[in-house]
Amino acid sequence: MLILTRRVGETLMIGDEVTVTVLGVKGNQVRIGVNAPKEVSVHREEIYQRIQSEKSGSAPEGGNF
């Protein structure tokens, strides 16, 4: 895992077309903005897991959604 330090307003690049910008920090929460082409899906991990569970027809681990 690559670990980076960024300040509010700073950006990192993923490949040539995806940018992740730190928008704000408040306590233990970090707000980030992601710019990516329409063909690149961007989801929070728990949403991605739900989508994958629904595709396979199984219930997600950890409870009901």
Curated annotation (Swiss-Prot):
Keywords: Activator, Cytoplasm, Repressor, RNA-binding, Translation regulation
GO cellular component, one term: cytosol
N-terminal signal peptide: none
GO MF assignments: mRNA 5'-UTR binding
Pfam family of the protein (one): CsrA
Intracellular or extracellular location(s): Cytoplasm
GO biological process: mRNA catabolic process; negative regulation of translational initiation; positive regulation of translational initiation; regulation of carbohydrate metabolic process
Primary site of residence: cytoplasm
The keyword Repressor is annotated on this UniProt entry: yes
UniProt superkingdom: Bacteria
Entry-linked InterPro entries: CsrA, CsrA_sf
Family statement: Belongs to the CsrA/RsmA family.
Known partners and oligomeric status: Homodimer; the beta-strands of each monomer intercalate to form a hydrophobic core, while the alpha-helices form wings that extend away from the core.
Physiological role: A key translational regulator that binds mRNA to regulate translation initiation and/or mRNA stability. Mediates global changes in gene expression, shifting from rapid growth to stress survival by linking envelope stress, the stringent response and the catabolite repression systems. Usually binds in the 5'-UTR; binding at or near the Shine-Dalgarno sequence prevents ribosome-binding, repressing translation, binding elsewhere in the 5'-UTR can activate translation and/or stabilize the mRNA. Its function is antagonized by small RNA(s).
Protein name (Swiss-Prot/TrEMBL): Translational regulator CsrA
Protein's organism: Shewanella piezotolerans (strain WP3 / JCM 13877)
